[in-house]
């Protein structure tokens, strides 16, 4: 470091930052600074940066300069507040809270009331004039500190608290008086000493330092890592730590705490949404332990604070130009803002809010497009419950996260995971969820809680994950020990089927039938976005999709093998077929003909088998070209190894053995068994398949090309506009392609001469082997188009057999952070993506008009679509149901890049 360079700054006062410093200050710290800048009532405090956390996580030690920086900021805070941290007569108390760049609700740690001790609790009694409040605050500190910082089992504190209420004959915490709470503090301290092997620290600075380290450590807890993996948040960002002077919502009926949203995060509708809890501290609301009142009720409880809060909500939404999620506390009639962030929302709310903000003039259409994503659109396409179905209503709660979920009732996360892994669909049912339930929530189809509101842990996390959730179903009594729920006389045991409607909050016994969502009906053309019965969600989706289609460069095709799928794809907005797998045309009743081809001993037998297949293939192609008239249809010639068309070797062996034992041997079965043995390969994925089949079995590819050409000619003569493209699979060298192309050109010429048509059929190849990608410049000499088969390219680049590795070690790789996400789900940009990028450049250098597409499963993956836009592909191809997602993401990619892609 040079003499003129400032040493790295690890601590920022709330007056120093702004909302654009999320990388450094985390979301919470950046937004506290922003609210401070706006002149809103924020308790004074400071933020320790994510850089300090990274140093700690990398080295195991805090940065050397951190303690002095924290001391300087603490001194400034004490001067401003005119009191010292934990002083015995008039203590300053602080909270220590996590705050990563991306919101991770409930995943990391918070400790409130730091600075309380046996001495300073007496000072807090004098300061507040409320003995019960002071001892309750001390009790909460020991409980939170013990669990979070010292690793004491939280259930031990809860059990002691329940026992105290039972002894007193009360059911809620607030009915315990100061004497009860003093006893509880003694008990809690004993629990800490016994379980943590040390006394609860009485030095306030030691409390603060240990809490800061605990927040740093909470970045790498199992639940935080699991959440990051689920939400695709990088693991190296670290968390900031916010040290904030305490304000108290538990000082009596004129105090309280709440969470507010500037719009309904479940539906997107404008209005006053949120939860409020009188005489409580902040964590009580989010934990869902006590049922809250609606935020609108605050108007009758404390109109002055309510009016001030509504004005602040309007200020924040206008400033952030988005739905804001706000945490606040009222201390004896004075409102304090503890946090704001752009709020998590459901998929439907995201689309509605984006278009509402355009109509209000706060954002433009390009920004609205960035406010939604393909994963949200996919959620909107899931089915909903049939309103006409006969149902048995169990109960009703708060509609926290929409969707229609059906599954077997389970009452803990372990069972949810276990049953889900064995293929069962489950509904996780709890009194309330906590961060330790995250893996169970991920495994479940839906979540049901008997406590908590729209801002509880279950609701916030479920909305973020797109999971169906109903909260606060108070009439449902959940018994986790006996693993059952009870509503009146109805008992639901673990394993019984229940249906949860996150859009209405209703819970049903048994399985309720589902119907297509309105969004799917819109894409299918059965609902017009401007029709009277079209809801505002469909109208919002239509507006955003129309803009995405206007700005995108990437075209979107479908993977479809028959006319029915092709027609559906076209309704969904497909601009052609990027992959028609001809092997799917050889299944069912036609399998016998393929068997004859495989068993052929002479040229004559083989030609006869091919002649039988030709008209069937041709008829399939005619239907396909008619369905996609005027749009390109890329037909892949036969790709899989031949043994896939033959009976299973074990079943066939048993059949032959049984027949021989009965002296009733079947000649055809014997020949089939010999063929199965002959064609058996140790690694069929890398064996006789793709172009190799066409080179080894004379006439196979010629028959397929003839069927394509004759079908195209017939459509042309019927005044159609067929645009067939012939794709050769698994090419590794240009010589393979040249030999097949020569044969194909000859067949096409024969068909053109016989039918008097000019077909203009393009011939290209799949790029699915590393050698093909590395020699793309040579292959482009014989190919008019490339289509990247990223499924096989991923397998061959990584040396993976997908079916084997996903069943064996993928989970371990994800847990160890070797993968952030499966490379079969999202394109591996560094490896596979690098080959795609170089093949694009080399191919276009040889043939500037080379058409480039991708037809692997990555074609419908949102993140991968952005990569394919960036490298300059012409189109992506995906399953029909994913087409709207690909269209949306292609638009988002174009709007983000502003012409930066390689086209």
Outline where the language-model segments fall.
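Nucleotide/phosphate-binding sheet-loop regions of phosphoryl- and nucleotidyl-transfer enzymes
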Residues: 2-389, 418, 424-427, 434-439, ...
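C-terminal accessory/binding modules appended to enzymatic or scaffolding proteins
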Residues: 18-21, 401-443, 552-554, 831-849
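Short beta->alpha connector loops at strand-helix junctions that form conserved
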Residues: 46, 450-452, 471-474, 580, ...
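Long, charged amphipathic helices and adjacent flexible linkers at domain junctions
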Residues: 68-72, 228-233, 369-419, 424-426, ...
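Conserved alpha/beta-domain cores
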Residues: 97-98, 519-521, 526-903
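Structural motif
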Residues: 242, 410, 427-429, 448, ...
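A short, small-residue-rich loop immediately preceding and capping a beta-strand
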Residues: 445-451, 469, 555, 853
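Residues forming the flavin
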Residues: 465-467, 481
């Amino acid at each position: 470091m040079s003499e003129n360079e400032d040493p790295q700054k690890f601590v920022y006062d709330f007056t120093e930052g702004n909302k654009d410093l999320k990388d450094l200050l985390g979301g919470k710290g950046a937004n506290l600074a922003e609210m401070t800048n706006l002149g809103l009532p924020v308790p004074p405090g400071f933020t320790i940066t994510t850089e300090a956390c990274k140093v700690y996580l990398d080295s195991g030690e805090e940065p050397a300069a951190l303690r002095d920086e924290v001391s300087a900021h603490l001194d400034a805070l004490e001067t401003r507040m005119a009191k010292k941290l934990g002083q015995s007569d008039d203590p300053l108390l602080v909270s220590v809270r996590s705050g990563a760049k991306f919101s991770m609700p409930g995943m990391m740690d918070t400790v409130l009331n730091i600075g309380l001790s046996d001495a300073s609790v007496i000072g807090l009694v004098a300061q507040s004039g409320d003995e019960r409040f002071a001892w309750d605050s001390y009790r909460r500190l020991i409980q939170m500190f013990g669990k979070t910082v010292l690793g004491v089992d939280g259930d031990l504190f809860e059990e002691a608290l329940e026992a105290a209420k039972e002894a007193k004959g009360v059911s809620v915490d607030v009915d315990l008086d100061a004497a009860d709470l003093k006893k509880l503090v003694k008990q809690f301290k004993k629990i800490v000493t016994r379980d943590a092997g040390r006394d609860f620290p009485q030095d306030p600075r030691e409390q603060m330092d240990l809490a800061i380290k605990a927040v740093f450590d909470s970045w790498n807890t199992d639940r935080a890592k699991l959440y990051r993996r689920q939400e695709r948040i990088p693991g190296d960002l670290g968390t900031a730590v916010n040290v904030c002077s305490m304000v108290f919502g538990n000082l009596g009926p004129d105090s309280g705490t709440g969470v507010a949203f500037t719009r309904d995060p479940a539906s997107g509708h404008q209005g006053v949404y949120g939860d409020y809890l009188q005489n409580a501290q902040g964590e009580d609301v989010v934990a869902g332990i006590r049922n809250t009142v609606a935020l609108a009720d605050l108007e009758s409880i404390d109109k002055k604070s309510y009016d001030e809060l509504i004005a602040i909500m309007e200020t924040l939404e206008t400033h952030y130009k988005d739905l804001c999620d706000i945490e606040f506390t009222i201390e004896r009639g004075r409102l304090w803002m503890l946090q704001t962030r752009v709020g998590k929302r459901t998929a439907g709310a995201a689309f509605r809010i984006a278009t509402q903000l355009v109509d209000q003039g706060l954002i433009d259409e390009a920004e609205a497009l960035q406010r939604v994503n393909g994963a949200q659109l996919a959620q909107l396409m899931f089915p909903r419950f049939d309103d006409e179905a006969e149902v048995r209503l169990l109960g009703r709660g708060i509609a926290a996260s929409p969707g229609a979920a059906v599954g077997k009732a389970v009452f803990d996360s372990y069972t949810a995971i276990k049953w889900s892994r064995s293929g069962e669909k489950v509904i996780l049912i709890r009194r309330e969820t906590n961060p330790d339930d995250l893996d169970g929530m991920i495994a479940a189809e839906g979540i049901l809680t008997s406590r908590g509101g729209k801002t509880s842990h279950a609701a916030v996390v479920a909305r973020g994950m797109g999971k169906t959730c109903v909260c606060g179903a108070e009439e449902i009594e959940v018994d986790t020990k006996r693993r059952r729920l009870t509503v009146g006389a109805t008992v639901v045991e673990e394993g019984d089927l229940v249906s949860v409607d996150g859009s209405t909050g209703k819970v049903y016994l048994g399985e309720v039938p589902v119907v297509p969502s309105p969004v799917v009906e819109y894409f299918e053309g059965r609902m017009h976005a401007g029709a009277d019965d079209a809801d505002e969600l469909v109208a919002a989706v239509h507006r955003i999709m129309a803009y995405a289609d206007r700005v995108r460069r990437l075209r979107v095709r479908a993977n479809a093998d028959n006319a029915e799928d092709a027609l559906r794809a076209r309704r969904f907005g497909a601009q052609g077929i990027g992959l028609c797998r001809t092997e799917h045309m050889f299944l069912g009743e036609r399998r016998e003909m393929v068997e004859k081809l495989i068993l052929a001993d002479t040229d004559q037998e083989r030609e006869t088998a091919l002649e039988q297949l030709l008209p069937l293939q041709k008829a399939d192609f005619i239907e396909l070209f008619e369905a996609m008239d005027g749009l390109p249809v890329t037909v892949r010639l036969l790709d899989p190894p031949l043994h896939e068309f033959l009976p299973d070797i074990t079943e066939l062996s048993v059949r032959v053995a049984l027949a021989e034992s009965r002296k009733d041997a079947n000649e055809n079965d014997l020949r089939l068994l010999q063929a199965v043995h002959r064609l058996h390969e140790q690694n069929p994925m890398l064996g006789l398949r793709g172009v190799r089949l066409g080179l080894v079995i004379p006439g196979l590819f010629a028959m397929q090309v003839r069927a394509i050409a004759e079908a195209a000619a017939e459509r042309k003569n019927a005044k159609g506009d067929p645009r067939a493209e012939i794709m050769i699979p698994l090419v590794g060298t240009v010589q393979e392609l040249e030999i097949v192309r020569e044969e194909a050109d000859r067949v096409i010429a024969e068909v053109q001469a016989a039918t008097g048509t000019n077909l203009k059929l393009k011939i290209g190849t799949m790029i699915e082997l590393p050698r093909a990608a590395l020699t793309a410049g040579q292959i482009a000499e014989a190919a008019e188009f490339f289509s990247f088969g990223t499924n096989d390219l991923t397998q061959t680049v990584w040396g993976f057999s997908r079916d084997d590795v996903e069943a064996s070690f993928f989970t371990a790789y994800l847990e160890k952070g070797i993968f952030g996400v499966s490379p079969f789900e999202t394109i591996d940009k560094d490896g596979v993506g690098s080959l795609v990028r170089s093949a694009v450049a080399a191919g276009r250098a040889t043939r500037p008009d080379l058409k480039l597409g991708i037809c692997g499963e990555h074609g419908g993956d949102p993140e991968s679509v952005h990569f394919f836009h960036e490298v300059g592909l012409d189109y992506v191809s995906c399953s029909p149901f994913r087409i709207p997602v690909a269209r949306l993401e292609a638009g988002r990619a174009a709007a983000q890049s502003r012409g930066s892609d390689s086209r």
